[in-house]
């Protein structure tokens, strides 16, 4: 009888030790512990000098200044634009001005943030300057960090004509090297035709 009593007591103790706790814990407010801070915007580093593409066929009226405001570590740059077109006859000689057929355009953003057109043909009413056949044109101006070093080259010409342009920037502090934008296009098809590689791109100066 005593053995049965001890076995019964042992079973009661064992069951009590294995029973789960029924204590209720306070529900955590995870919104308070981990508040949503919104989607983090990607950080853009203009030090990377990413070449951003534009539309070489867009009209001047569609232009929107693509520069940005940079307020720290602002640098000043000396920009240089050089461009030249050439139209030759079957002997390789420059075509006289009165017989020129090329209609090339070079566009850049000037220091006043306006899109400026340079043209090979004097009938282009949008042009601020005109190119002379076979002679390079060189322009210089200053700009600061956040300015778009911009170059557009497009147009049509007869076989054997060509258009080339380069824009570059050198920082006055001497420490920042900006890769230039360069175009060199030749029209080699019969008759009048568009250049094969119209170009429009810019780099935000870091």
Predicted regions and their residues:
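Short, solvent-exposed aromatic-acidic interface loops
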Residues: 156, 179-194
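Exposed low-complexity, polar/acidic, P/S/T/G-rich flexible segments that act as propeptides
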Residues: 103-108, 159-173
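Acidic/polar, low-complexity intrinsically disordered N-terminal segments immediately downstream
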Residues: 18-110, 206
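Tryptophan-paired
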Residues: 110-143
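Low-complexity, repetitive regions of proteins mediating host interaction that are extracellular
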Residues: 2-5, 38-42, 200
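Hydrophobic beta-strand segments within beta-rich accessory/binding domains
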Residues: 78-93, 140, 144-157
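Short, low-complexity, Pro/Ser/Thr/Gly-rich segments in the mature regions of secreted, periplasmic
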Residues: 192-206
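Sec-dependent bacterial lipoprotein signal peptides
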Residues: 1-19
């Amino acid at each position: 009888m005593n053995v049965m009593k001890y076995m019964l007591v042992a079973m009661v103790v064992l069951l009590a030790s294995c029973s789960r706790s029924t204590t209720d814990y306070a529900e955590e407010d995870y919104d308070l512990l981990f508040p949503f801070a919104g989607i983090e915007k990607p950080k853009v580093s203009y030090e990377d000098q990413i070449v951003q593409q534009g539309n070489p066929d867009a009209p001047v009226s569609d232009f929107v200044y693509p520069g940005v405001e940079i307020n720290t570590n602002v640098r000043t740059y000396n920009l240089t634009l050089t461009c030249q077109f050439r139209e030759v006859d079957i002997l390789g000689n420059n075509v006289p001005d009165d017989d020129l057929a090329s209609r090339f355009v070079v566009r850049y953003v000037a220091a006043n943030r306006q899109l400026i057109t340079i043209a090979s043909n004097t009938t282009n009413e949008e042009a601020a300057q005109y190119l002379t056949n076979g002679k390079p044109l060189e322009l210089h101006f200053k700009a600061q960090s956040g300015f778009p070093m911009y170059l557009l080259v497009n147009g049509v010409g007869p076989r054997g004509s060509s258009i080339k342009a380069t824009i570059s920037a050198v920082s006055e502090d001497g420490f920042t090297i900006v890769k230039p934008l360069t175009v060199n296009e030749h029209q080699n098809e019969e008759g009048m035709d568009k250049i094969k590689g119209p170009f429009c791109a810019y780099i935000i100066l870091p």
